[in-house]
């Protein structure tokens, strides 16, 4: 990091969070403005999307890739007319393609809104409730763990050490009689 910008491995220039730029009411953006003219600035919250490969992490490889042959199959000896088979293939493929497009047109944006809200709530709860609750619990349980540790070292350690010394002299010998 240098001079109010982040540069990633591809050479993209990212803006620095406002607190690292100086006073939030008077950020020192003049020096940064001169450097911005050299490279294109990318905001950390915007991202280019790939319109060709829409599943770059392969989330739906095993679930959604269903073709005609995966659903409908005629065994040897039981074949319909070739024209019927071709028409069935075309009907299945076109119906699946256009019905998916229709459903995504109607429900895609509302579902994206619902899932966006859901994951925003989930992130908010994790950041502002779960992690602080766990940290609080760990701080509160620390005194109990100290008492438990003292108990174990005072009572259990000597007991098990004595039992270990008792059984340390036990020897087993096996003889095979003929």
UniProtKB/Swiss-Prot annotation:
Recorded GO MF terms: ATPase binding; identical protein binding; inward rectifier potassium channel inhibitor activity; nitric-oxide synthase binding; oxysterol binding; peptidase activator activity; protein heterodimerization activity; protein kinase binding
Residues recorded with modification N6-acetyllysine: 5
Entry-annotated residues carrying Phosphoserine: 2, 9
One Gene Ontology term from the biological process aspect of the record: positive regulation of ERAD pathway
Transmembrane parts of this sequence: none
Cross-link (Glycyl lysine isopeptide (Lys-Gly) (interchain with G-Cter in ubiquitin)): 5, 26, 30, 39, 47, 57
Renumbered residue ranges of the record's region Interaction with CAVIN3: 82-94
Protein task: May act as a scaffolding protein within caveolar membranes. Forms a stable heterooligomeric complex with CAV2 that targets to lipid rafts and drives caveolae formation. Mediates the recruitment of CAVIN proteins (CAVIN1/2/3/4) to the caveolae. Interacts directly with G-protein alpha subunits and can functionally regulate their activity. Involved in the costimulatory signal essential for T-cell receptor (TCR)-mediated T-cell activation. Its binding to DPP4 induces T-cell proliferation and NF-kappa-B activation in a T-cell receptor/CD3-dependent manner.
Oligomeric form and interacting partners: Homooligomer. Interacts with GLIPR2. Interacts with NOSTRIN. Interacts with SNAP25 and STX1A. Interacts (via the N-terminus) with DPP4; the interaction is direct. Interacts with CTNNB1, CDH1 and JUP. Interacts with PACSIN2; this interaction induces membrane tubulation. Interacts with SLC7A9. Interacts with BMX and BTK. Interacts with TGFBR1. Interacts with CAVIN3 (via leucine-zipper domain) in a cholesterol-sensitive manner. Interacts with CAVIN1. Interacts with EHD2 in a cholesterol-dependent manner.
Name the UniProt record assigns to this protein: Caveolin-1
Protein source organism: Oryctolagus cuniculus (Rabbit)
The encoding gene: CAV1
């Amino acid at each position: 990091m240098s001079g109010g910008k982040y540069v990633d491995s591809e050479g993209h220039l990212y803006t620095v969070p406002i607190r690292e730029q100086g006073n939030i009411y008077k950020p020192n953006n003049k020096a940064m403005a001169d450097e911005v003219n050299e490279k294109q600035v990318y905001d950390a919250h915007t991202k280019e999307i790939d319109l060709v490969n829409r599943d770059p992490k392969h989330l739906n490889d095993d679930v959604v890739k269903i073709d005609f042959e995966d659903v409908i199959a005629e065994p040897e000896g039981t074949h319909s007319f070739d024209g019927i088979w071709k028409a069935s293939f075309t009907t299945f493929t076109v119906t699946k393609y256009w019905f998916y497009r229709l459903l995504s047109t109607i429900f895609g944006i509302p579902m994206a809104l619902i899932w966006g809200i859901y994951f925003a709530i989930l992130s908010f709860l994790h950041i502002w409730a779960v992690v602080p609750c766990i940290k609080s619990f760990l701080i509160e349980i620390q005194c109990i763990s100290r008492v438990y540790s003292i108990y174990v070292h005072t009572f259990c350690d000597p007991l098990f050490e004595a039992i270990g010394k008792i059984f340390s002299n036990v020897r087993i010998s096996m003889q095979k009689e003929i």
